[in-house]
Amino acid sequence: MVWGTGYGNPSPLNPYGFASLHRGGLNPLILAPENITFDTLNTHNDHEETHGESPEVPKASIAPAGRQNVPVLQQNQENEDNHALGGSEDAKDEREIRFSAIKTLYNYYSEGPSTPIMPHLVNRLRGLDALAKIDATLTKVDMNAAYIFALRPTFPYSYGYKQRFSNRRLTTSALCYARTGLSSFLTVDKTYTSNSPLKGGSRGWPIFNVDVSSHVAEPHMRTLSPIGLEVFNLATSQFSKTLLTASSKVFTQSLYTADILSIFGEVFLPHVMQPVSNYTPILVRALLALIHILGPGSGNCSLSSSIFESSIPQFLTVSHSTNMSNRTRYCLHTRSAYKDMFRNGIPPQSTLPPTLAPEGSSARVLIPEALVTSPMFPWLLILVSSGPQFFLYSKDASINTVDIGSRGRITSPIPDVAKLDLHRLWNLFRFDGYRYIDVVIVGADRDYVWPYQNGVYVHGGKGPNGTGNYGNADVHDGIGTIFSSFNNNVNVQTSDLMLGLLTLWNHITTTYATEEEVTMAIKIAAAFALVYPVQPIVYSGCPKAFQRHTSYYQPSSENCYATDTAEVKSVWDTVELSVQVNNAMVLGMTLPFGQPTLSSAQWYNNIDKAEISMFKVGNLPLQNLDYLSLDMMEFYAPTTGQLYDIRSDNLILSAHRTVNLGIGYTALADFFAYLASVPAQSFYHDRMVTSPISKQTYSVYERFIERFIDDFVGWDRCDLFNLDTLLGAKHIAGVASSPIPWHCSLQRCPLPIIMHYTGLTFGQEHITVRDVAGVEGLQQIVMRDFQGRIVVERLGTAAPSRIAVKLDWSRLSAWYSDTTCAIPLSDRVMEIVNYAAIWDPTQERHAQVSCTHTLAPISFRALTCLSLYSIRVSTLHHLMTTRAKL
């Protein structure tokens, strides 16, 4: 990962001379000295190119786990921070990271009561990225990864204003990568002639034959710096085993434009170039989805050899209202070896024309009738290159055309905007006063899924249903991972379009994102979370689960993973995790918990230090827990056959052999609530984060939660978790029905909101229960913090002998049984175990196991087990941080 967004003049905020597309100014994520200012934030420059050696990135230090009080961040607080590091001297040295830029950003975004919540989140996202990237344990190549932005273009249409376009185009090889997702950047230090094959360079890159169209002019070629070459060499060595193939099996491409990627290129390209291999599978999925979304070109582009003509469904049909003859066109040609991977068993589909509306033109999006009439498509997608905003609207009024203006703004009103089922969601999407349409989400069911039909999956080295051979064993790990059908017992339909969009927000929020980009990401993620109630489908255990599905790793008869060293074999493990959506689509797929592609303990150590999301489970390092809920109670290691208690690194003595990972709505809500609730010092995470939440930051958290509840879930979806309802003497009457029962999946209710409602806030030490005189069965429940102050005082029912709050969900279960909810609820009595009951490690483990064994509905596992954990600050932060990688 890198920071910065292009070319520009150097400044304290911009030591590399990179320019941001954000309002023509500079990206405040750039790490800066102590005297950082924001004077240049809105500075417009002509984006002159600057070259030369990259300045040294200052080492940074951050207050790690162990701090008991987190004061309001101040710019000159370094001494206090270092003093309060806590722990041994070695721990101090290891965690010393100066974060003056982050502190400045924090103060900048925290000024004044009128500061909107979004900048707070943006700041946290930036801080997350920065702290992870400036870790002193990273190598110089990693530290200087930003220099590879020498390849990065600035797209003139991305944000609705012009930029100087000369020398801004992608290199041919860079564009090849972005369009195919199947190669590292090739020999970018060479100048190419039209239609000449690109040969592998002297740095060990594989040989590729990529036909370069004459439309891609040589003056736009760029060269990598020596540092960039080192980065690419490292990246390529990691990509080669799983993504690359011989030259005869790759692509022939004709690429006619440099601005086709628009905002997607802005998001993806930095990650394409970064050397950490754990992003590889997500990147490839996202890039392939990008191809899907953009589609082939028109005009002079011949589609005879395109994969799109046979495999991509007609999600959208777009006709440009302006003559594009004077503009560069784009299209994608592929060799038959690649095309045939997706052709077998897939009925012909219509070609997907381009969805780009050039500046100054308008586009009319014609939505296929099947998308309008199918009940599986509650939302519609319009994707244009004019900017990151999008809009979500219902198709109740059967609207099938939308006019998009030159900046993606809607030029003709949609009649059913006023009938939005999610009008509160739209209120959440207001940003900088704009309300206009760029993208509308399209749902997909099994008739509109690429490339699977009727459960048939395509594996690079396997044919349909795991038989046959396409002769592309090297390609499949890059492509096949995107479309995973785990076995014939589960009919998993995959939409790379949806997966790509879901991945998009993940990448936006972990990089140098501007406010607009973060806004787009939140909208996309929110749309997914609301439209698709999810059920997790989890596979673990080597012999059966990994036998007949597309894995990121080469299969091995020994341990299901092809690794090079015994050390890697003994350390890394992998879990393939999927989410089945409406029995039709998978949003979250292969989540790599380990990447044995570098075959190096040094790489493992670097990742261990650099990845915010990593924490240890026994001997098992976990990372990329991007979509996980807080109810991850136990983790099953397939190679050892053991269950691990993620909190204490201790084995759980249990017969369970499943991975209890809840995925769904919390990917959005929990994460952003967490970002708003934890100070910057807590972002650096080794094993456990114990820093309590400062008063100021907690107020930010509360404001965010209140707004989120009001704008996002205000139609009583999460009122089920209101403390007055849970603990009061009221009856639970259920929630109001809505056209689509999104509220059915309580698992998707944001867990921080549950905590907010239930009063199980951070740091309670104990719960006191007293009978209320004169009222049978009613007790006073008091929660106190570490200082003995009352945190929550409510009336309700409890079991004093267990020092626990008992909740009878029978009424709720009965209500759920009358709905179309996919998750059946049990009428078992739930227990929210309090701090006193789990303080002792033995009792704690017992309580945890009890929760796992007695609570059947996974949707309630989240509530119960979060409540179980939330009273312990360290554990809560520990679990919360698993999603800090989003």
Curated annotation (Swiss-Prot):
Annotated spans, Disordered: 42-61
Keyword Acetylation: yes
Record PTM: Acetylation is necessary for viral assembly.
Signal sequence, start to end: none
Modified residues (N-acetylmethionine): 1
Basic and acidic residues biased stretches: 44-56
Subcellular location field: Virion
Similarity annotation: Belongs to the totivirus major capsid protein family.
Protein name: Major capsid protein
Protein species of origin: Giardia lamblia virus (isolate Wang)
Taxonomic lineage: Viruses, Riboviria, Orthornavirae, Duplornaviricota, Chrymotiviricetes
Gene designation per UniProt: gag
